[in-house]
Swiss-Prot record:
Residues at which Mg(2+) binds: N291, D300
Protein name: Protein nucleotidyltransferase YdiU
Residue numbers binding ATP: G118, G120, R121, K141, D153, G154, R211, R218, D300
Function: Nucleotidyltransferase involved in the post-translational modification of proteins. It can catalyze the addition of adenosine monophosphate (AMP) or uridine monophosphate (UMP) to a protein, resulting in modifications known as AMPylation and UMPylation.
Cofactor: Mg(2+); Mn(2+)
E.C. number(s) listed in UniProt: 2.7.7.-, 2.7.7.108
Enzyme active site: D290
HAMAP family: YdiU_SelO (MF_00692)
Root EC class: transferase
Chain's gene name: ydiU
Family indicated by similarity: Belongs to the SELO family.
InterPro entries cross-referenced by the UniProt entry: SelO
Example GO molecular function: ATP binding
């Protein structure tokens, strides 16, 4: 893999080397750690973390670097793919100011209490102080065994690491609250995995992602303390989180009120987060409580996926294929269920049930209002307050599921329909608006033809029943837009910021994985460039906006994923 390939995505900015970064580790300093030092699987008590160092790897090599994250942290891109800085990002070297640890937490998995979980292969190096004095945890995922590894090997494979690296940055560019990713490093070692848990394990290349977040604390960090009846540590952890990450609450409220206000804010942020997921068609895939961020960020990119054919019941996770607990349409309900588990864990701090119920109500209100506003924007409307808007939406969702229709492409096509063609040149996947007939002049077939790029089965899409139904809905939509009486350019602008043209389709990530396995980094570099501007027309990347190709329909890694990573 060439040095030039690693650097061609954008110009190098002069920044300090990683070795000059400042670390100040308040979490380790302010919370009690595990007094035991044995790095063997075991139950940990009365501690928020265990100090543990990464296990060195044979031959680390930098595969990808996120320039924007490096600039945010004030860290220069490593001078070469095998530089000393890469040794740090692989866990082979620890800087003097780092204090690596694995966090202790528990969680509910698929609706059942799973007991102690913890960072079984993720090791936080420390808290970096950025040039603007913000704190960020740097965490290596796949860094080796910890006391929380149970029977696992503490490593991660290339395929899951590429997916996490890419999706972290894709979500940020989409405007979705998320953790970030700084680097992707190959370990030079093989990892044995049974990808679909079907009795066919095989060797895969290993990798390590350096994840970045103000905090990786989860609902499960609090759940384990409540479950193990450690109320004083529960209070310490809550005080730490509020003081560090919700300082406006700490300065204006005192216990016990501050805990209720904090829970309310966690509920509010989670409502906004899930509404964003729904807006862009993202399905997390494994919404266990240990995968829910206390800061309202998307965390732990495992068997996630993006809606291609619109389906409220779709899940990318093979483990969830039967129950579909974590499917697209269930995500708001599951988020509230998870928040209820967090509320239960916080009862030693918030004895007033009404305060907890209020927080949960805030989640529902926040999600509903945010999602309603986002749906209005996706349709180019100022709001969804007309009497027939509910039926307009429900009929749309039913119609989209009648024939396999790509969610992302459908809304981009809807954005481009020529309601009132405007002058000037507007980039579009269709002919310029002035060359299109007005929708008033189109018959049903001509109107539906504008959506051909979104259909996976054109024969079904243009059947009489579906054509009539979709065209009927489109004419209702057009009438509704005209009721607004707003300039066409305003509708287009709203929709262009709410409806991405580019998302990280599973097959695109899989192509990047397979290319890296061959030693080719050009695919991931191109994806990183495209994903920086998901709402923009990018003619040089037009092929990456197309619907999933037929060869990827049933290909492992493209259509179905497991928790194996």
């Amino acid at each position: 893999m060439s040095q030039s390939n690693l650097q061609r995505s954008m110009p190098i900015v002069t920044l300090p080397d990683l070795f000059d970064a400042r670390f100040d580790n308040r979490f380790v300093r302010q919370l009690p750690g595990d007094p035991e030092t044995r790095n063997v699987p075991r139950q940990v008590r009365n501690a928020g973390y265990t100090q543990v160092s990464p296990t060195p790897v044979r031959s680390p090599r930098l595969l990808a670097w996120a320039d924007e994250v490096g600039e945010m942290l004030g860290i220069a891109r490593p001078a070469s793919p095998v530089s000393p800085a890469v040794e740090v990002l692989a866990g082979n070297r620890i800087l003097p100011s780092m204090q690596p640890y694995a966090a202790r937490y528990g969680g509910h998995q698929f609706g059942h209490w799973a007991g102690q979980l913890g960072d079984g292969r993720a090791i936080t190096l420390g808290e970096l102080i950025s040039p603007n004095d913000k704190r960020y945890e740097l965490q290596l995922k796949g860094a080796g065994k910890t006391p929380y590894s149970r029977t696992a090997d503490g490593r991660a494979v290339l395929r899951s690491s590429v997916r996490e690296f890419l999706c972290s940055e894709a979500m940020h560019s989409l405007g979705v609250p998320t953790t970030r990713a700084l680097s992707l490093v190959a370990t030079g070692e093989a990892v044995i995995r049974d990808m679909f848990y079907d009795g066919h394990p095989g060797a895969e290349p290993g990798a390590i992602v350096c994840r970045v977040s103000p905090s990786f604390l989860r609902f499960g960090n609090f759940e384990i303390l409540a479950a193990q009846k450690e109320p004083e540590l529960l209070r310490q952890l809550a005080d730490f989180v509020i003081g560090e990450h919700f300082p406006e609450l700490a300065s204006s409220h005192r216990p016990p009120e501050v805990y209720a206000k904090w829970f309310e804010e966690v509920c509010r942020r989670t409502g906004i987060l899930v509404a964003h997921w729904m807006r862009v068609g993202f399905v997390h895939g494994v919404m266990n409580t240990d995968n829910m961020s206390i800061l309202g960020l998307t965390i732990d990119y495992g068997p996630y996926g993006w809606l291609e054919g619109f389906d409220l019941h779709w899940t990318p996770n093979t483990t969830d294929a039967q129950g579909r607990r974590y499917c697209y349409g269930n995500q708001p309900k599951i988020a509230q269920w998870n928040l209820t588990r967090l509320a239960g864990a916080l009862t030693p701090l918030i004895e007033d049930d009404a305060a907890l119920e209020h927080g949960l109500a805030v989640f529902g209100e926040t999600f509903n209002n945010t999602w309603s506003g986002m749906l209005a924007a996706k349709l180019g409307l100022a709001s969804l307050e007309h009497s027939d808007d509910d039926s307009l939406l429900s009929d749309l969702f039913e119609t989209l599921q009648q024939v396999e229709t790509d969610m992302t492409l459908f809304f981009r096509c809807l954005m481009n329909i020529p309601l009132n063609p405007i002058s000037g040149n507007r980039a579009t996947t269709f002919p310029a608006p002035e060359n299109l007939e007005s929708v008033d002049q189109m018959n049903d077939h001509g109107l539906v033809e504008l959506f051909r790029p979104a259909f996976y089965d054109a024969h079904q899409a243009f059947s009489h029943a579906h054509l009539t139904r979709l065209a009927g809905w489109l004419r209702r939509y057009i009438a509704r837009v005209r009721q607004e009486g707003e300039p066409e350019g305003l509708r287009y602008h709203r929709m262009s910021r709410a409806n991405p043209k580019y998302v990280l389709r599973n097959y695109l990530a899989q192509q990047a994985i397979e290319a890296l396995e061959r030693g080719d980094d050009s695919v991931i570099i191109r994806l990183m460039e495209m994903l920086k501007h998901p709402y923009d027309e990018q003619p040089e990347h037009e092929d990456l906006a197309a619907r999933r190709p037929e060869w990827a329909r049933n290909k492992p890694g493209c259509s179905a994923l497991s928790c194996s990573s």
